[in-house]
Amino acid sequence: MRRLFTSESVTEGHPDKVADQISDAILDAMLEQDPRSRVAVETLVTTGIAIVSGEVTTRAYVDIQDIVRKTIMEIGYTRAKYGFDGETCAVLSSIHSQSPDIAMGVDKALEAKEGELNAQDDLELVGAGDQGMMFGYATNETKELMPLPIMLAHKLALKLSEIRKSGTVPFLRPDGKTQVTVEYDENDRPVRVDTVLISTQHEPNVTIAEIKEALVKYVIDPIIPEELRDDNLNILVNPTGRFVLGGPSADTGLTGRKIIVDTYGGAIPHGGGAFSGKDPTKVDRSAHYFARYVAKNVVAAGLADKFMIQVAYAIGKAKPVSVMINTYGTAKIDEDKILKAVLELFDFRPGAIIKKLNLLRPIYKKTAAYGHFGRELEEFTWEKLDMVDELKRLL
């Protein structure tokens, strides 16, 4: 049966993404001075104000006000007429230390306390910072080994931001959203793009026709592949007819409100934990990254066309309480053998994940817009394919 599947993305100027970027900018500043910082920072942005709160244990000193203002201005909120700008907005901060009850379980995992863990350094003693389920996914339908709808949505959103910042289209403002609907055939392969939706904030003195003409030329045409387009492609631009008031002045933004945009666009389940503002002892972040790393290497090794992995943790324990895989019937060998190889080759303890992916670095602000997965940046170690040969050798 043919099916349609849709995913969305947002620009860096979307209020929720403004909040994510502020939280991760603060995290990076702390990790830069003290790589062992424990950070859980939440941000709220609304008309004329940014509020930062959370739990932090660190030896670093960072200027929260300065980081917040610089981040907002880098995004593009630099003019008071936008209703929100980095120079004039108020910044409130309420940050306190991490609960000692949580810290005792993170500092030394339950297995270490009971003598079951042979750790080579103190990092390997780390217990999970919370309970929860984390998912990783990969599919060979794109070169990034990501679902096509979310990759196209991210690329459209990034291109929209690029033409705004470059001045190519001078009437654009920072807030924006994209959405892509892809048609899949009976073999579950993408065959065409059915609908492209772009909503972008703009100056008041421009018409919908002018906006649509510019976005088709500078955003849609460069991003949507010709082989996936036909005469029935449905293009929607600012369907409400007007999008002048936007950003935090029109829609309050919160850290962690775009978890489906951050991951796989709804192609697989999500455990609910957000990423931004959290240091890597929080398995909400590090285990999601590691699960993507595992899934991508399995698919790249040719063991399956699609691969999902679920990993679940208990707070204070290092080893996961469960690991489950699903190849959706695309496995090239027995799934039990794939699972056995995954468990043999990949160490899912939080400390081991941090070491393997080198996560105690100030790399997180880059993740906070346009997707945590599918972008092969040097800092994104979870996108590396350095376990492919090991998987092939074992199987």
Swiss-Prot record:
Subcellular location: Cytoplasm
Entry EC number(s): 2.5.1.6
Cofactor(s) annotated in UniProt: Mg(2+); K(+)
GO cellular component entries: cytoplasm
Residues at which Mg(2+) binds: 16
Coiled-coil ranges (or none): none
A Pfam family hit: S-AdoMet_synt_N
UniProt-annotated binding residues for ATP: 14, 175-177, 242-243, 251, 257-258, 274, 278
Pathway: Amino-acid biosynthesis; S-adenosyl-L-methionine biosynthesis; S-adenosyl-L-methionine from L-methionine: step 1/1
Chemical reaction(s) catalysed: L-methionine + ATP + H2O = S-adenosyl-L-methionine + phosphate + diphosphate
Residue sites binding K(+) per the record: 42
Cofactor binding mode and count: Binds 2 divalent ions per subunit.
Signal peptide start-end: none
Keyword Magnesium tagged: yes
Catalytic EC class: transferase
Region (Flexible loop): 98-108
Record carries keyword Protease: no
UniProt KW keywords: ATP-binding, Cytoplasm, Magnesium, Metal-binding, Nucleotide-binding, One-carbon metabolism, Potassium, Transferase
Record-linked InterPro entries: ADOMET_SYNTHASE_CS (IPR022631), S-AdoMet_synt_C (IPR022630), S-AdoMet_synt_central (IPR022629), S-AdoMet_synt_N (IPR022628), S-AdoMet_synthetase (IPR002133), S-AdoMet_synthetase_sfam (IPR022636)
Principal place of residence: cytoplasm
Function noted in UniProt: Catalyzes the formation of S-adenosylmethionine (AdoMet) from methionine and ATP. The overall synthetic reaction is composed of two sequential steps, AdoMet formation and the subsequent tripolyphosphate hydrolysis which occurs prior to release of AdoMet from the enzyme.
Subunit structure: Homotetramer; dimer of dimers.
NCBIfam families xrefs: metK
Family: Belongs to the AdoMet synthase family.
Protein name: S-adenosylmethionine synthase
Organism whose genome encodes this protein: Thermosipho melanesiensis (strain DSM 12029 / CIP 104789 / BI429)
